[in-house]
Amino acid sequence: MPTINQLVRKGRKSHKGKSKSPALGYVYNTFKKEEIKTPSPQKRGVATRVGTMTPKKPNSALRKYARVRLSNLIEVTAYIPGIGHNLQEHSVVLIRGGRVKDLPGVRYHIIRGTLDTAGVEGRMQSRSKYGAKKPKNKK
């Protein structure tokens, strides 16, 4: 514990918070070959690997994921939400931040219904989260 005199001389340092999705915080300048700190809400990337992984201890499933090389040359692991997907290697995807609690190392989600990613078929509720179109009304 510091003395009053030490606090008067130095004071307390405030800690800066750490980003939960650091890959979204950089833009790569190809001309200067340097990274610029510019946060963005989403990033485009190319899927380099698509597969399944098993979750942490109390849960059991085969969760779909994709390894994505982003436009800023950082490679991340992103979760593919929803039932069924059409992604394969070299698919162009859009990712957003947001971790998957039971998959270690997965800090990003792929946005369904944009670029090469199709929306979830037959989805009626929470359609906007899964890129599903509004169904046609039959009369």
UniProtKB/Swiss-Prot annotation:
Q: Which organism is it from?
A: Limosilactobacillus reuteri (strain DSM 20016) (Lactobacillus reuteri)
Known Pfam families for this protein? Ribosom_S12_S23
GO molecular function annotation: rRNA binding; structural constituent of ribosome; tRNA binding
Family per UniProt?
A: Belongs to the universal ribosomal protein uS12 family.
Known function: With S4 and S5 plays an important role in translational accuracy.
Where do the segments described as Disordered lie? 1-22, 37-57
Q: Which residues carry this modification: 3-methylthioaspartic acid?
A: D102
Could you tell me what this protein is called?
A: Small ribosomal subunit protein uS12
